[in-house]
Swiss-Prot record:
Residue interval(s) of motif FRIP motif: 24-27
Protein name: Sialidase-3
Topology within the bilayer: Peripheral membrane protein
UniProt record similarity statement: Belongs to the glycosyl hydrolase 33 family.
EC id: 3.2.1.18
Mapped BNR repeat ranges: 129-140, 201-212, 252-263
Catalytic reactions on record: Hydrolysis of alpha-(2->3)-, alpha-(2->6)-, alpha-(2->8)- glycosidic linkages of terminal sialic acid residues in oligosaccharides, glycoproteins, glycolipids, colominic acid and synthetic substrates; a ganglioside GD1a + H2O = a ganglioside GM1 + N-acetylneuraminate; a ganglioside GD1a (d18:1(4E)) + H2O = a ganglioside GM1 (d18:1(4E)) + N-acetylneuraminate; a ganglioside GD1b + H2O = a ganglioside GM1 + N-acetylneuraminate
Residues that hold substrate according to the record: 25, 45, 179, 181, 223, 243, 339
Length: 418
């Protein structure tokens, strides 16, 4: 077993193999509290291109004190369909049964996303399998495409889940973030308007049956993640952070557990590089709580300041810094032009648009997709992320870090330019 010890710990879990061009991309990370186990997933590809994905690989890590012992890399051959490549891992832990559900898409052969968008012919299947022993063994794959999407698929040019973790709400609902390219009109045999929109797949019966939520509109949104945060008088609100091509991150809120979202808004504190990039978000209850926050001019921001993103039903209680001490933690490249310098941001008042901190830089240099996990009750977080010396697809690293390190950037002004 490979051991990573003490805090702010870093280890390479998946390394590009230069001789045979094997590349690992699209990280997904899950922490399972009862067994103190991490599951780290990635796509194995024969090149960096999306259409050269083959199957998923994973590693199991066990927390021992403030260290993680990692087992060997394993191919997840159970997560395959004949004649398809497996992509976009999205795991979620169901606390009542102890099952780990792993969602993914299986895409026909080497059919590219561009081809699907050009012809309006979806080549992806919505699939999942589950483990009842924290990833030691896996069941058979199940194709949910017809059951969950059905006839609506004729309006989808293509789609994907995640990538990165899903969540279970306090109500028990399981949520798998996703996005689809919607075809709004055709000209002869070609779709003339195809735009991506985020949505949720969900289950209210512990994963027995699954359903499709409504699209986040009208803003173009893609790869996304969600986190549950407190709203008014115990009302729980779902926060969604979504990729856009429009220079800034899109944020949207749901008051019905992810079936429907309000109109998304671009947050100008959270930049996107050219073309956008996937990012990760989690909710957490930090062990250390600062009492004030500053705006961009350096003045204290009142804790009761209302967020222009939300309607009156989402307002937090009077006097709340975060009403129950729940924060958001967000990982994303911080450079406005390129996928560089992976940052960790926090928001101590999740429904307030102006409360995002400056980023604490987790990785300097090329940085791509990432996925966050919370080690509950220990003030620790984990991040699985793409990085490298020259390109962000050279390796996928795991880092364990503390809330104290994130809070070292303890003001809430806008991120500086990169």
């Amino acid at each position: 077993m490979e051991e990573v010890s003490s805090c702010s710990l870093r280890s390479t879990l998946f390394q590009q193999e230069e001789q045979n061009r094997i590349t690992y991309r699209i990280p997904a990370l899950l922490y399972i509290p009862p067994t103190h186990t991490f599951l780290a997933f990635a796509e194995m590809r024969t090149s960096s291109r999306d259409e050269d994905a083959v199957y998923l690989v994973f590693r199991r890590g066990v927390m021992k004190g403030c260290s993680v012992e990692w087992g060997p890399q394993q191919p997840l051959m159970e997560a395959t369909l004949p004649g398809h490549r497996t992509m976009s891992p999205c795991p979620v832990w169901e606390k009542n049964t102890g099952r780990v559900y792993l969602f993914f898409i299986c895409v026909q052969g080497h059919v590219s996303e561009r081809w699907q968008l050009l012809w309006g012919r979806n080549a992806a299947r919505l699939c999942f399998l589950y483990s009842e022993d924290s990833g030691c063994s896996w069941g058979e794959v199940k194709d949910l495409t017809e059951e969950v999407v059905g006839s609506e698929m004729k309006h989808w040019a293509t789609f994907a889940v995640g990538p990165g973790h899903g969540i279970q709400l306090q109500s028990g609902r399981l949520l798998i973030p996703a996005y689809a390219y919607l075809i709004s009109c055709w000209f002869l045999c070609f779709p003339c308007s195809v735009k991506p929109h985020s949505l949720m797949f969900y289950s209210d019966d512990l994963g027995v049956t699954w359903h499709c939520g409504k699209f986040i509109k009208p803003q173009v949104t893609g790869e996304c993640q969600v986190a549950e945060v407190p709203g008014k008088a115990g009302n729980l609100v779902l926060y969604c952070s979504a990729r856009t091509p429009n220079k800034f991150r899109a944020e949207a809120f749901s008051t019905d557990s992810g079936d429907c979202f309000q109109k998304p808004t671009l947050n100008q504190q959270l930049c996107e590089p050219r073309g956008g990039c996937q990012g990760s978000v989690v909710s957490t209850r930090p062990l250390k709580m600062p009492y004030t926050c500053q705006d961009s001019s350096g003045k204290d921001v009142p804790s009761t300041q209302k967020c222009p993103l939300m309607d009156r039903s989402l307002e937090v209680e009077e006097g709340a810094g975060a009403p129950s001490g729940t924060w958001l933690l967000y990982s994303h490249p911080t450079n406005k032009k390129k996928r560089m310098n992976l940052g960790i941001y926090y928001n101590q008042n999740p429904l307030e648009v102006n409360y995002w901190s400056r980023p604490w830089i987790l990785n300097r240099g090329p940085s791509g997709y990432s996925d966050l996990a919370v080690v509950e009750g220990q003030g620790l977080f984990a991040c699985l992320f793409e990085c490298g010396e020259r390109h962000e697809d050279e390796k996928i690293d795991f880092c364990l870090f503390s809330d104290q390190e994130v809070l070292s950037c303890d003001d809430c002004t806008s991120p500086s330019s990169n």
